[in-house]
Amino acid sequence: MRKFIAIALVFTMALGLTACAGGGSDIHRLNMATGGDAGTYYAFGGVIASVLTNKIENVEVTAQTSGGSIDNARKLKNKEAEIAFMQNDVLQYAVTGTESMKDDGAMENLCAIASLYPEAVQLVATKSSGIKTIADLKGKKVCVGDQGSGSEVNASQIIAAAGMSYSDFDVQYLSFSEASTAMQNGTVDAAFATSALPNSAITELANYTDIVVVPIDGDIADNLIAQYPFYAKTTIGTDVYGVEAAETVAMMAVLTTTADLDEEVVYNITKTLFENQTDLIAGNAHGREVTLDTALQGVTVDFHPGAVKYYKEKGIM
């Protein structure tokens, strides 16, 4: 009987040692909050999650659907996710407890890992309207987005930076899909939309109506960025909608976490993100935009110490 107990104890200890030795350390299982299942955040988030899981030892990342940036901030705060996609203006509002996040209180524990790609503010007009500049909006019918939406906030800030106000034109509060229909029907001359490129509704509009992309550049862009530093300059290329290229401004999609996440884990996430671009591109076209040249762009909150460590190694901090 004693011999049986001794053998059982040895067997149990062996199992325990095997379990501990399996990967050399604990597995870090991380939930990544993204966006709706039809959106860019979820699609690209799934690619990033796969690359991080395959390339980093003892890290497993799972992309989860969510309601987008505001929801993701709350998920990080409530520890329902460890990393998340967020638009950089919402990240700023979340950390400071202002604007769209004022009812949630300041989430000072949130911090950035990296800027990923721009979400461009797109001002599109029908060619027949004759609109070529923001000043040309005066007296026209202009859709600024749903009232209180991100696009509408961006539109109001840009109009103010141009020294204008909504009283200068006939303002319409419509989603861009609704605005697209109205532009085809000739009841709206121009519309604002903030999204990743290309915007499917604009692509569809361009199939039915001759359009122009109106530049948001020069002093207007400079004034805007001086007041709202989470904006960044970008270009809508000719290849996007098949029309003349235009300079504009953009929010940045930012990979975000909290200060609680292990520094070495975040270091490895950051390193892997920027040193496996081929894998990112293979999974999603936005992988081309994940570069060290724009890693810090548009971020107005603190970066996680693990990300800072990597950026200092690469000489960009």
What are the roles of these predicted feature ranges?
Residues 81-117, 199:
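Acidic, polar ligand-binding/catalytic clefts
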Residues 140-157, 228-300:
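Ligand-binding clefts/hinges and TM-proximal coupling segments of bilobed small-molecule sensing domains
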